[in-house]
Curated annotation (Swiss-Prot):
Subunit description: Homohexamer. Interacts with ViaA.
Protein name as catalogued: Regulatory ATPase RavA
Modes of activity regulation: ATPase activity is stimulated by ViaA.
GO cellular component, one term: cytoplasm
Coiled coil: none
EC number(s) stated in the UniProt entry for this protein: 3.6.1.-
Species this protein is from: Shigella flexneri serotype 5b (strain 8401)
SMART domains, per the entry: AAA
GO molecular function: ATP binding; ATP hydrolysis activity
């Protein structure tokens, strides 16, 4: 076997060659190439004239001496037009029912069937056997067929509860294509003089028969780690709970796992990684509604769980809560003591903040938690200007409970010791205190926990950086995952600075 990284580089160069002259079709080419290299089937959905047939023709050039067969289905298509005509001579001389398959689907490595849903039952039944078993019954004999890639296309989806669903379920990869959108790409497409039938792939990059057969065995040796399986099972469980989720058969899940193994193999890895699971967005949908739903669920999986983002945020929340508890234990030492002002001519006693309190936003800790506005509150954030005005003139005072949401109206007073006290609806009070002095730094317990959490974050980010070199995953998905990890890292660093 070639060095894994050399193989990944070769497949990347092969894909680049196949993509030449095709605009906004890189993802489709790459997934069709992955399907061809792993012996799977692809369904292309989209309007006429958007290069669906050209994509299939291009894939022929990925292999040395590959034969291609393409056919436009109609309601009047016959098995003879797809699988070959009957041999009149064999029927006449020997009474054998045998087809002449040369130049037809049974002898092609790359097959493209357009308007697939117009095929009749006779064609569909034979096609199912060809896809499932890679076999073709020719008269009394069962012959192996060399098909590596079947690309089926249509501008519509099969009708629900029809005889076509069995065939549709065999189309592992499903891609929804549209017209060229970008202005520059549209211009380049209009002015391109490239002959669509030219072979754009150098001989050295083409896959030999021996390589293809060897790779099929090696793909099966790619491992599925426990943590990746847990992510897959989490996705499956979540889909089962959603009323509008598409039905995904066990067969489709199993075939999808082999596709993930192929993605890892041709990316130079020995095991499936979380990043490979993004491919499931092109395997599990059924129609337009389920396409959006599947993408949303996989996005949640990738940005929330695949690299432990949500788990790290939960740990961070617990550390921050513990830090606040430790600060509350010290609140008597740091209770906010106001300065009483002379009020000779004022009916209301006036106060001001201590001179060492200068922040524009003040976070004050409750000596004991209270339930305010149906929320368990441990600290309140005040705008300094609003608090100063209340201390001077009285009236209404508002603050953000636990520092989140909108500022809420509070029952606040100054007690006889010149401390601020907040009261709940039952008039239970809690003295407000300043957080511990920054000079004291973080408690050792909190500092250690944050350092351990940051170390785990660095490990997860390093794993993602290693795994994201995957030809078959769109860059925008990788960008969202990077953003989610950076957000977690930023929150950890912010907590370390408190």
């Amino acid at each position: 076997m070639a060095h894994p990284h050399l193989l990944a580089e070769r497949i990347s160069r092969l894909s680049s060659s196949l993509e030449k002259g095709l605009y906004e079709r890189s993802h489709a080419i790459r997934l069709c190439l992955l399907a061809a290299l792993s012996g799977e089937s692809v369904f292309l959905l989209g309007p006429p004239g958007i290069a669906k047939s050209l994509i299939a023709r291009r894939l022929k050039f990925a292999f040395q001496n590959a034969r291609a067969f393409e056919y436009l289905m109609t309601r009047f298509s016959t098995p003879e037009e797809v699988f070959g005509p009957l041999s009149i001579q064999a029927l006449k001389d020997e009474g054998r029912y045998e087809r002449l398959t040369s130049g037809y689907l049974p002898e092609a490595e790359i097959v493209f069937l357009d308007e697939i849903w117009k095929a009749g039952p006779a064609i569909l039944n034979t096609l199912l056997t060809a896809i499932n078993e890679r076999q073709f019954r020719n008269g009394a004999h069962v012959e192996k067929i060399p098909m590596r890639l079947l690309v089926a296309a249509s501008n519509e989806l099969p009708e629900a509860d029809s005889s076509l669903e069995a065939l549709y379920d065999r189309m592992l990869i499903r891609l929804w294509l549209d017209k060229v959108q970008d202005k520059a790409n549209f211009r380049s497409m209009l002015t391109s003089q490239q002959d669509e039938n030219d072979n754009p792939v150098p001989d050295a990059l083409q896959v030999t028969d021996e390589e293809y057969e060897r790779w099929q065995k090696e793909i099966g040796e790619i491992t599925l780690p426990d943590h990746v399986f847990e992510l897959i099972f989490m996705l499956r469980q979540q889909l089962d709970k959603l009323p509008d989720a598409p039905y995904v058969s066990d067969r489709r899940w199993k075939k999808a796992i082999r596709l993930l193994q192929a993605s890892a193999f041709f990316s130079g890895r020995s095991a499936v990684a979380p990043v490979d699971l993004i491919l499931l967005k092109d395997c599990l949908w059924y129609d337009a509604q389920s396409l959006n739903l599947i993408q949303q669920q996989i996005d949640v999986l990738m940005t929330g769980h695949a690299w432990q983002q949500q788990g790290m945020l939960t740990r961070l929340g617990a550390i921050v809560q513990r830090h606040l508890q430790l600060q509350q234990q010290q609140s008597d030492k740091t209770a906010l003591t106001l300065i009483r002002l002379g009020g000779i001519f004022s009916r209301r006693q006036q106060y001001q903040l201590p001179v060492n309190v200068t922040a524009s936003t003040l976070t004050l800790l409750l000596q004991k938690p209270l339930k305010l506005h149906d929320m368990e509150v441990v600290h309140i954030s005040f705008e300094r200007s609003a608090l100063e005005q209340w201390l001077s003139k009285g009236g209404e005072i508002r603050g953000k409970l636990n520092g989140i949401g909108f500022a809420q109206k509070l029952n606040l007073e100054v007690d006889s010791t010149q401390h601020l006290v907040v009261r709940d609806v039952s008039l239970q009070g809690s003295t407000l205190a300043l957080p511990g002095s920054s000079a004291e730094g973080l408690p050792g317990e909190i500092k250690q926990q944050l350092e351990e959490l940051e170390s785990d974050w660095r490990k997860q980010h390093a794993l993602f950086s290693e795994q994201q070199k995957c030809l078959f995953i769109p860059g925008d998905w990788l960008g969202r995952i990077e953003d989610s990890l950076q957000d977690v890292g930023a929150q950890i660093r912010q907590a370390q600075q408190c």
